[in-house]
Amino acid sequence: MESAKVLFLDRDGTINRDIGRYVSSREEFILIDRADEAIAIAREAGFRIVLITNQAGIARGIVTPQDVEDVNDYLNELLAERQTSFDRCYYCPAHPNYPHPEYDRFIDHRKPSPRMVEQAIADLREEGFEVDRSASFFIGDKLIDVECGQRAGLKTILVRTGHNEESLCEQHQIFPDHVADDLYQAVTGYILGQPTSRD
């Protein structure tokens, strides 16, 4: 079994701009500056890359599973331009306030539950990779991302893009290992310890 370090990433507000509603099409998907570069750098440094995202707009009838998958496919197309991609993508379609007969069985996968992370770890194990949690990270813009990562035994980074819930984390006494301005700084400045100059 090969040891693997993994970068688990939230999507909206971390990789792409939070537009104030569910992203339902490629046209609404706008990369945050240098997010794709950050993912490529992490891949070059030996990280497996896994997407973990809540998409409750599905249960609410605002977006469809196909919409979410199309947007994720588009993201992978953008990453392919940098010769990188996600190893796996997971999303939770459920929401406790919007019961849906098709999606309610996934409610316990919703972040901050670590179920999607644990599923990814199990799937990678089936492929011959044993995830080293002590060398793996969860990066997101919300309190639930930090909590999810911590519950899965990962190091956590909160980014100030998107919702920027730094003060909310403090209120709930849930502290990430690091706070970064954006995904690029999180990867290069903290995980890899490289200079973060944008020149």
Swiss-Prot record:
Acetylation keyword on record: no
InterPro entries found in the cross-reference section: HAD-like_sf, HAD-SF_hydro_IIIA, HAD_sf, Heptose_bisP_phosphatase, Histidinol-phos
Primary residence: cytoplasm
One Pfam short name: Hydrolase_like
Residues annotated as the enzyme's active site: 10 (nucleophile), 12 (proton donor)
Binding site for substrate: 10-12, 18-22, 53-56, 110-111, 142
Site (Stabilizes the phosphoryl group): 53, 111
Annotated TM spans: none
GO biological process terms held by the UniProt record: carbohydrate metabolic process
Catalytic activity: D-glycero-D-manno-heptose 1,7-bisphosphate + H2O = D-glycero-D-manno-heptose 1-phosphate + phosphate
Coiled coil: none
Binding site for Mg(2+): 10, 12, 141-142
GO cellular component, as recorded: cytoplasm
GO MF annotation: an example: D-glycero-beta-D-manno-heptose 1,7-bisphosphate 7-phosphatase activity
Xref: CDD domains: HAD_HisB-N
Subcellular location: Cytoplasm
Record-annotated site: Contributes to substrate recognition: 110
Assembly and binders: Monomer.
NCBIfam families: HAD-SF-IIIA, Histidinol-ppas
Name used for this protein in its record: D-glycero-D-manno-heptose-1,7-bisphosphate 7-phosphatase
Biological source species: Chlorobaculum tepidum (strain ATCC 49652 / DSM 12025 / NBRC 103806 / TLS) (Chlorobium tepidum)
Name of the coding gene: gmhB
